[in-house]
Amino acid sequence: AYVDSPDITTYTELHNSWLEAYINWQYVEMFNIGKAEEIMFFSKTNTYPVNEGRIQENINNEKTDLSNPNDWSCQGFPGLDYMIHGIADSENEIINQYIQNPLNGKYLKVVINELNDNTDLVLNDWNTYRNTFVNSVENTATSAFNMLTNDFVYYFEKGLRTNKIGIPSGVFSNNPLSNKVEAYYSSKNGIEDVSRDLIENALNAVDPVSYTHLR
């Protein structure tokens, strides 16, 4: 609706849908197994910070194939954050960008469709893979249980503590790096400051018992 009729009402609806989906993502991001691992779902869905210059090139070139690893930072929830909140400095200016340049709307659709298609692949595969996964409890490197455990530990240390908290807060540098948070553009341009909300949901998604053992 927004691409066909960009105004403040459809813009707000788009923002709210993006935020709801991004919050939900926090609860599944650590499960990088099966089809998700095969298609690099984690990287395609939540690589940040985005590559602004490459996104603009993709827009101008009307690019529709985002399978190149160099385009991981041009799609997913961070890519949508830029397209919804970052191509100008205010809601009205952003809406005008879509009115004046239809290529922005075309690329927004490409990013949304890519995310939806990848999600469908993972969900459809899970419907057939679930029983195999549940019954795979052997103590081997390729058993589902061990893979799940290893992926969870990796996510906890790298995806959560390092990427979501450590790097933006400046733990690994002399100063905080605010541009390396999730939802950077929504917060930066005053649309809605949701970066903290995403981190809090990511922490809530981590099982308290596992957190106690891993910290």
Predicted regions: what is each one?
Residues 185-189:
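Glycine- and acidic
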Residues 212-213:
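Conserved small/polar residues in nucleotide/adenosyl-binding loops
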Residues 21-183:
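Acidic/His-rich structured neighborhood in mature extracellular/periplasmic domains
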